[in-house]
Amino acid sequence: MTSVSECFQSLRDRKQCGLIPFITAGDPDLETTAKALRVLDASGADLIELGVPYSDPLADGPVIQAAASRALRRGVKLEDVLNIVKGVQGDIKAPIILFSYYNPIFYRGIEAFLEQIKSAGVKGLVVPDLPLEEAETLLKPAAEMGIEVTLLVAPTSPIERIKAIAHQSQGFIYLVSVTGVTGMRTQVATRVEDLLKSLRNTTDKPIGVGFGISEPEHALQVKNWGSDAVIVGSACVKRLAQGTPEEGLKAVGEFCQRLKQAIQ
């Protein structure tokens, strides 16, 4: 399993747009999550975002909130999530990026949290509610441990703030395509194209676009606008939760293949 930066460099060398599916750990259950990581990897995922269930997920829309609630009701904890990551080491090529809110990190202690996720094999970290002003407290120790912390750029951010975020973000820059929470939308905001151009003038770091991408044609549109990767969350979580675990795995695998075909 390579680092996040190495994966993006490989994509760039091959002139390819990356696919980053997101799933919530523990939904519908831990065993299915482990299988889903393998299925996504085999179905074209270049990197995989794995969400740690949290009781107050402010950035998440109804689909991911519901998945997190189901996982929490089953008693899923960070340790369970990391055991899954450990269990798939050697089976998958795609680096795993952990998606966690800041409170569980702060509660455990930054150093202890980072040591835990590093030993499990996590390569990257996205913390949606991490303020830029406090980012250094996490970025510095994470970098020393080889974990890349990716920061989010909101479409409403002033240009100076965008520059500051782009400068500090590690691995890639996570461009939020819409204001508000994650979720499936019928179209991708055309403002994303302008934001991508603005970011390109600011940094040469890879850019991944997420929030609101729910169809292969959305992924292709974002790729054509110049994104280095497309991030698809709610649409994957919804499919994985459909029917039996076996049906969910089949649905999310086929969807991932369709997304990959669209951007190749």
Swiss-Prot record:
<protein>
    <recommendedName>
        <fullName>Tryptophan synthase alpha chain</fullName>
        <ecNumber>4.2.1.20</ecNumber>
    </recommendedName>
</protein>
<dbReference type="InterPro" id="IPR011060">
    <property type="entry name" value="RibuloseP-bd_barrel"/>
</dbReference>
<feature type="active site" description="Proton acceptor">
    <location>
        <position position="49"/>
    </location>
</feature>
<keyword id="KW-0456">Lyase</keyword>
<feature type="active site" description="Proton acceptor">
    <location>
        <position position="60"/>
    </location>
</feature>
<dbReference type="InterPro" id="IPR002028">
    <property type="entry name" value="Trp_synthase_suA"/>
</dbReference>
<comment type="subunit">
    <text>Tetramer of two alpha and two beta chains.</text>
</comment>
<dbReference type="GO" id="GO:0004834">
    <property type="term" value="F:tryptophan synthase activity"/>
</dbReference>
<dbReference type="InterPro" id="IPR013785">
    <property type="entry name" value="Aldolase_TIM"/>
</dbReference>
<comment type="similarity">
    <text>Belongs to the TrpA family.</text>
</comment>
<comment type="function">
    <text>The alpha subunit is responsible for the aldol cleavage of indoleglycerol phosphate to indole and glyceraldehyde 3-phosphate.</text>
</comment>
<keyword id="KW-0822">Tryptophan biosynthesis</keyword>
<comment type="pathway">
    <text>Amino-acid biosynthesis; L-tryptophan biosynthesis; L-tryptophan from chorismate: step 5/5.</text>
</comment>
<keyword id="KW-0028">Amino-acid biosynthesis</keyword>
<dbReference type="InterPro" id="IPR018204">
    <property type="entry name" value="Trp_synthase_alpha_AS"/>
</dbReference>
<dbReference type="GO" id="GO:0005829">
    <property type="term" value="C:cytosol"/>
</dbReference>
<dbReference type="Pfam" id="PF00290">
    <property type="entry name" value="Trp_syntA"/>
</dbReference>
<keyword id="KW-0057">Aromatic amino acid biosynthesis</keyword>
